[in-house]
Amino acid sequence: RHHLLRSGPISGPLWWGKARREEEVQRRRCAEIADFLDLADHGSMPVGALPYGVQKRIEMGRALAMEPRLLLLDEPVAGMNQEETEETAHHILQIRRELGIATLLVEHQMDLVMDLADRVMVLDFGQVVAIGEPAEIQRNERVHQVYLGGAS
């Protein structure tokens, strides 16, 4: 979040009080994000020493620190076990519901997509197969043909 600070290494000493207050505000915001994503207990550990699912949540936290209006998530649960997948799905829903941040999710685990998405776009080699609500997509015969080889 340092890019959000209005004082830098040169101007900081000239505006010491203001720079210090800004730093405190940014630190509090980062702590809020860590609490929101259940990361507060991991603050003193090197990221590389943490479990994979926690590392992915830290990545989401870094993105949230930028105060986005749209959060782009490219396969956020790839390589995760079931518990990590469920935790991540919970946090994605929290981000949407509690923070009001729109999310664009690219994911191949269709059960997760159906649980998280309001709208789904199905692509086949870059071509749009279907767009609609999860229930519509599940009933779409073309989607079944593309993804299940014609079985429905």
Each model region followed by its residue ranges:
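Glycine-rich phosphate-binding loops of nucleotide-dependent enzymes
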Residues: R1-S152
